[in-house]
Amino acid sequence: MKVSLLITLAVLGVMFVWASAAELQERGSDQKDSPAWLKSMERIFQSEERECKKMFGGCTVHSDCCAHLGCKPTLKYCAWDGTFGK
């Protein structure tokens, strides 16, 4: 029983490697271009990211403040919104 299970797992492993190699060969140069494309996308997303305002930091809307903080409408600063958790 253990031997047949081991043989089955080995065959499945070989089939997985074979299918992966065939797919990699089919893609060709796409695989070579991917890292450069990912690097360019990384730069785009980093430029859009911005830090959140911490407690008592200046803000204009709630989304400026970090998690569990909200923008107070009168003095425009980030303060605890009364929530807990993640």
UniProtKB/Swiss-Prot annotation:
Disulfide cross-links: 52-66, 59-71, 65-78
Keyword match Acetylation: no
Coiled-coil segments: none
Entries under InterPro entries matching the protein: Huwentoxin-1
Alphabetical list of Pfam families matching this protein: Toxin_12
Localization of this protein: Secreted
Protein's UniProt keywords contain NAD: no
Annotated propeptide span(s): 22-51
One GO CC term, this protein: extracellular region
Signal peptide start-end: 1-21
Assigned keywords, A-Z: Disulfide bond, Ion channel impairing toxin, Knottin, Secreted, Signal, Toxin
Function: Probable ion channel inhibitor.
Written domain comment of the UniProt record: The presence of a 'disulfide through disulfide knot' structurally defines this protein as a knottin.
Family stated for the protein in its record: Belongs to the neurotoxin 10 (Hwtx-1) family. 28 (Jztx-11) subfamily.
Protein name: Kappa-theraphotoxin-Cg1b
Organism: Chilobrachys guangxiensis
Upper lineage: Eukaryota, Metazoa, Ecdysozoa, Arthropoda, Chelicerata
